[in-house]
């Protein structure tokens, strides 16, 4: 079996085209909008939750160009941090909607969430013909017409995300697995996982400053991996970043890139915050 590559895409300010504003389109918006992407939504009708949640500008009668019969709405105050749609086109899809004003710009992802499967397939092949095979396209409920799949996401705080994917075979089962993982974390008690991620990020940034040369990349990675393993899930949230950076400096400079850490018991007693 050929496997999928699971990646965490950075979509901030990237142009996304979503065709279809129904129930499935709404689920896509919940995942896409928080990424700060510049999303254009094409649909003649919208799910009742879309405007109040992601597109209040669409029915803002205070806008100078507001009209009841308007076909195109651009968010005048769009910002990647505001969790809003950038543009709404009140219409069925037309081929011309693939055009972008800036010829140097491009759609990062194109998705269809419409019940017309033949039209969805046509749009898929049109995108490939116009933009090349590398264009990322996703057709809802058609795994063969998907360059990527939406999995079941488990978010712990703002920074720790876990993706469960069945590679398009059974999204619901993926969601059940996600829920089981959530329950396991709940049973394990308060591990302060987001705090752990933040502190480990600070630690990695610090060791990059202490060992900035490219030739030191492998040592930095090996040191960070070994350090994380020694503290484990239960204790990473409590690490003392400053003390560990001092330890790194000694092991890197004075001990000639040593990976021989102090015993775990000593680490937990001397390199955790009081």
Swiss-Prot record:
InterPro entries according to UniProt: Met8-like, Met8_C, NAD(P)-bd_dom_sf, Sirohaem_synthase_central
- The domain of life is Eukaryota
Looking at the keywords, is Oxidoreductase present? yes
Pathway involvement?
A: Porphyrin-containing compound metabolism; siroheme biosynthesis; siroheme from sirohydrochlorin: step 1/1; Porphyrin-containing compound metabolism; siroheme biosynthesis; sirohydrochlorin from precorrin-2: step 1/1
SUPFAM superfamilies for this protein: NAD(P)-binding Rossmann-fold domains (SSF51735), Siroheme synthase middle domains-like (SSF75615)
The UniProt record lists the EC number as 1.3.1.76, 4.99.1.4
Say which family it is in: Belongs to the precorrin-2 dehydrogenase / sirohydrochlorin ferrochelatase family. MET8 subfamily.
Q: How does it assemble?
A: Homodimer.
Function, as annotated, reads: Catalyzes the conversion of precorrin-2 into siroheme. This reaction consist of the NAD-dependent oxidation of precorrin-2 into sirohydrochlorin and its subsequent ferrochelation into siroheme.
Keywords attached to this entry: Lyase, Multifunctional enzyme, NAD, Oxidoreductase, Porphyrin biosynthesis
The record's GO molecular-function terms, alphabetically, read: ferrochelatase activity; precorrin-2 dehydrogenase activity; sirohydrochlorin ferrochelatase activity
Q: Which reaction does it catalyse?
A: precorrin-2 + NAD(+) = sirohydrochlorin + NADH + 2 H(+); siroheme + 2 H(+) = sirohydrochlorin + Fe(2+)
Active site at which residues?
141
Any one biological process term the GO annotation gives: sulfate assimilation
Binding locations of NAD(+): 23-24, 43-45, 93
Name-wise, this protein is: Siroheme biosynthesis protein MET8
**Outcome recorded upon mutating residue 141 to A:** Loss of chelatase and dehydrogenase activity
